[in-house]
Amino acid sequence: MTQVAGNPGTGETLLRQAAAHYQAGRLTDAEKLYRQVLTLQSGLASAHVSLALVLFRQGRTEESIAAFRQALKIAPDDTDILYKLGNMLLREGGPDDRRIEESFACFLRHARLTFGAGGKGANAPHRVRHDREQLEYLAQTYGLREWKFHLADGERIAACTVNAANAAKATEEWNNRNPRIIVIDDLLGEEALEKLRRYCWGSTVWRETHPEGYLTAMPEHGLACPLIAQIDEDMRAAYPGILGAHLLRYLWAFKYDSRLSGVGTHADPSVVTFNFWITADDANLDPEHGGLTVWNVATPSGLTTQQYIGDTAGCQAYLARAGARSITIPYRSNRAVVFSSDLFHETDMMHFKDGYTNRRINLTMLYGRR
């Protein structure tokens, strides 16, 4: 543990006592001691982080964010602080115009520092196949001959990213449906759609490997470009009747193998889910499938996040007991399925063409907290 200036052992003793109070839930006492430590040595980044965690557990979110910011000023290359501040801003921050921008900047710096040295993912066959195809694409498109961290152009565009032509119809359907499940076609403008595709093709952000056959990109992996921040802004402007005061709280993207399975039955920890697909239609060899199945039953109260996200068999058993009915929305490029996040859903069976740019890609944006 870092020694704090002052009497020998004083800092270490205070930090140990503060940590013990925190672990025991004595948050007021922990806060007092961490502030004492920072009075002795204000440049101790770890103490600012610990104070931030105490403040968050007390429900003092903005003060917690300020403490994380102070820690980052002291240690701007600390990946743990970058991750924590990025997450706090995205998941818990208020309706500040710069919240997403600051969060994404933290995540991008985290990704560059964490993955900049290169290194590939797991050795699962579908991962190896994907990485080989992506490296070929990077060589052809950017002249890259070896595997290393790379982000394609993800800057904002001059045009509006979201096509608002269907907004009125979609909002009316949303307000009249029970359960709330709607489809919005032509979600993004053509320029935004094409640029988002190229960002997903050209960025080595696909860091999580799932045995079913798909890969995941998260904000902390680099799925945090200014274009996505612009899409969020334009989405909230186009669909206030659906999103209301709900803010973007998390996002991810999935990239699939051409024939293997997709995401199993689960629900999302948010209020409104925007799930949209960006791969071109001619890549889909089974146009009546490849989309999303959504059930008309929501997660019961008292279920933990791990139960409704990580337990496909348990979710299916619950749906069977509830006599749930499902609808399957076929895949279409630039189609969004928008639904109440607590509804169970899963990826439909799929069959896409082989080839790197034919891989099915979907983005999920989660709004609000529940």
Name each model-derived stretch:
Residues 23-24, 57-58, 91:
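Register position in tetratricopeptide repeats
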Residues 91-336, 342-370:
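Fe(II)/2-oxoglutarate oxygenase catalytic core
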